[in-house]
Amino acid sequence: MNKQSWLLNLSLLKTHPAFRAVFLARFISIVSLGLLGVAVPVQIQMMTHSTWQVGLSVTLTGGAMFVGLMVGGVLADRYERKKVILLARGTCGIGFIGLCLNALLPEPSLLAIYLLGLWDGFFASLGVTALLAATPALVGRENLMQAGALTMLTVRLGSVISPMIGGLLLATGGVAWNYGLAAAGTFITLLPLLSLPALPPPPQPREHPLKSLLAGFRFLLASPLVGGIALLGGLLTMASAVRVLYPALADNWQMSAAEIGFLYAAIPLGAAIGALTSGKLAHSARPGLLMLLSTLGSFLAIGLFGLMPMWILGVVCLALFGWLSAVSSLLQYTMLQTQTPEAMLGRINGLWTAQNVTGDAIGAALLGGLGAMMTPVASASASGFGLLIIGVLLLLVLVELRRFRQTPPQVTASDS
């Protein structure tokens, strides 16, 4: 493949067996988690007939994920990362078995579902942080953009396939099948992960875990480059919460039930296109400026989305947001890995991922509040243009990020 091609280079899967193992394990894991994501809300709704109870389970799991990301960041910088990944995956699978056994009971326990949701949310995020911290060692820092794009494609593809499989399983066999196959898939991921090389953390002095986590916070706040990247990531995630307005906007556009699906598919489709056409991103001389501009463009797309007179134009705006946000996210991921010291990778990746979780929750809450005071169209536009104003201010304030220059990575024969 020509080094100037816009298309994503897949050669990393051929030349790096360890990354290929992670790629396979991640895809199976995404599908397994998707089966779980369909089953839990359906089971709780069937048991309680309460959307509040369903929302509570999501909130509890999200809180456990946040704690797991914090703890996982400290563990990934302190212990052998392969062991942390395997321990987290195996322990998570045990929780899925618990959900399966609970579903088979004559009267399943709602409390057990909540507790196992906490268990799985914590251990799933624990492994995510360790895997992110280990990626530079697996592929080399010069290949991080390519690895990030392949990972994004894996997540998007798995996120499309798994709900469809989960829905079919619910219709034919019930929630126990979803939980059982999620557990089986999780344990299957251990097979490729066992082939990973040892991934020891860099040597560093022992300190109290809280002190270690605070050191990560201090580094994030003290570094205008890494801190700016994390801030942009949080704002971008807030913008993606616009999906909570889809049902109301669909009524405004008088969309049919089948047409509403296009709204939900638009952002993942745009993001997949962004990942597939990311071939030149790694060769950008000014990735910080490109990140800022693509983020601003994504905010503008959300601002225009609700103003479109026809739903098909709204779908185009969402797809544009997906593409631009994919570009920004890939640049964020690559710069975060390359500009963070090896000894801090676990904690900084944990904090970066955690702000994605909290940014989505904050964005959904703000849009819900705006929706109570404004029309859906006004809410969507206000969120997009409000974030655009903040983004313009950050473009002026984040001088180091805006001016950051890098030497494009050399392309080897295996990449061409």
Curated annotation (Swiss-Prot):
Compartment annotation: Cell inner membrane
Species of the source: Shigella boydii serotype 18 (strain CDC 3083-94 / BS512)
SUPFAM superfamilies linked: MFS general substrate transporter
Topological domain spans for side Cytoplasmic: 1-21, 77-83, 131-156, 200-218, 278-287, 337-356, 400-416
Periplasmic side: 43-55, 105-109, 178, 240-256, 308-313, 378
Pfam families: MFS_3
Functional description taken from the UniProt entry: Component of an export pathway for enterobactin.
GO MF: enterobactin transmembrane transporter activity
Membrane topology: Multi-pass membrane protein
Gene: entS
TM region(s), chain numbering: 22-42, 56-76, 84-104, 110-130, 157-177, 179-199, 219-239, 257-277, 288-307, 314-336, 357-377, 379-399
Protein name per its UniProtKB record: Enterobactin exporter EntS
Gene3D superfamilies: MFS general substrate transporter like domains
Record family assignment: Belongs to the major facilitator superfamily. EntS (TC 2.A.1.38) family.
Cysteine disulfide partners in this protein: none
Alphabetized UniProt keyword annotations: Cell inner membrane, Cell membrane, Membrane, Transmembrane, Transmembrane helix, Transport
Annotated GO CC locations: plasma membrane
